């Protein structure tokens, strides 16, 4: 259950009011979750190939690269090895760069973390992720791993890198002085990209055109949310709470990109005041 007093509205660094709810983790006594009610009850949806402008300093919808232009950074070795195994399943008609991937591998070094450990990401081919099929490829542009998941009847989170299937959700763990951990599950904003995110001409969680889904995020991304929370019991608690919160009054604090802007049009010949009869 949500902890007593766990619901709050607070301001993020970018300014807008955002609503949160706090849960104790039933599977981990030392972990507490802060859940972004505002984003999870919004109607964001991925619009890859349907208006996505990409992640460049200038809009580039014609490239149909989505957020795949810089490769995917692996969260750990387990993540990397899972993707390597998935790549072995891909056929030539699913993967445009199959020949390159099989010849040189699908990952490459990309620097070191703060502790000096080597970091890895998916290899780049023609200035984008090796798994990204480009416009003109027979099945269409998009992720080869995602395509294979659809064809094989699996969820794409079983095959794609963690960061890819989680987007635009993001979980950040913060260890407290008493040794407990606070896990904050919210949207993946520009800051998730590091310093370069601020230079993007467009980002989907700020774009009203991406908030047109038929279901709220916690429903449309239910499988992703379940895996990120790590336990069915916690997932069920979160969904039950959000179902109740979404139908309650007043409604949850709205996402700034989803809030409609209303304009008042004056009738010709009036100064905006009511006309006397």
Language model regions located:
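Short loop/turn segments that flank or connect secondary-structure elements
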Residues: 1-277
């Amino acid at each position: 259950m949500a902890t007593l007093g766990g619901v709050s509205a607070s301001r993020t660094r970018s300014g807008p009011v955002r609503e949160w709810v706090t849960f104790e983790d039933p599977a981990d006594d030392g972990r507490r979750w802060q859940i972004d009610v505002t984003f999870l009850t919004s109607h964001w949806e991925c619009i890859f190939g349907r208006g996505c402008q990409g992640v460049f300093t200038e809009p580039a919808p014609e490239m149909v690269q989505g957020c795949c232009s810089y490769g995917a950074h692996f969260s750990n070795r387990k993540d990397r090895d899972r993707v390597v195994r998935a790549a072995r399943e891909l056929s030539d008609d699913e993967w445009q760069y199959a020949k390159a991937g099989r010849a040189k591998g699908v990952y490459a070094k990309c620097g070191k973390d703060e502790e000096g450990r080597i970091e890895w990401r998916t290899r780049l081919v023609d200035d984008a992720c090796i798994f990204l099929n480009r416009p003109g490829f027979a099945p269409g542009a998009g992720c080869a791993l995602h395509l294979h998941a659809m064809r094989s009847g699996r969820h794409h989170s079983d095959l794609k890198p963690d960061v890819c299937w989680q987007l635009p959700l993001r979980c950040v763990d913060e260890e407290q002085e008493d040794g407990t951990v606070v896990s904050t599950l919210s949207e993946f904003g520009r800051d998730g990209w590091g310093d370069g995110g601020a230079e993007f001409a467009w980002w989907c969680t700020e774009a009203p055109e991406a908030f047109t889904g038929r279901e709220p995020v916690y429903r449309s991304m239910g499988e992703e949310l379940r895996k990120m929370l790590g336990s069915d019991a916690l997932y069920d608690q979160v969904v039950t709470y959000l179902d109740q919160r979404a139908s309650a009054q007043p409604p949850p604090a709205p996402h700034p990109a989803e809030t409609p802007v209303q304009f008042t049009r004056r009738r010709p010949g009036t100064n905006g005041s009511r006309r006397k009869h």
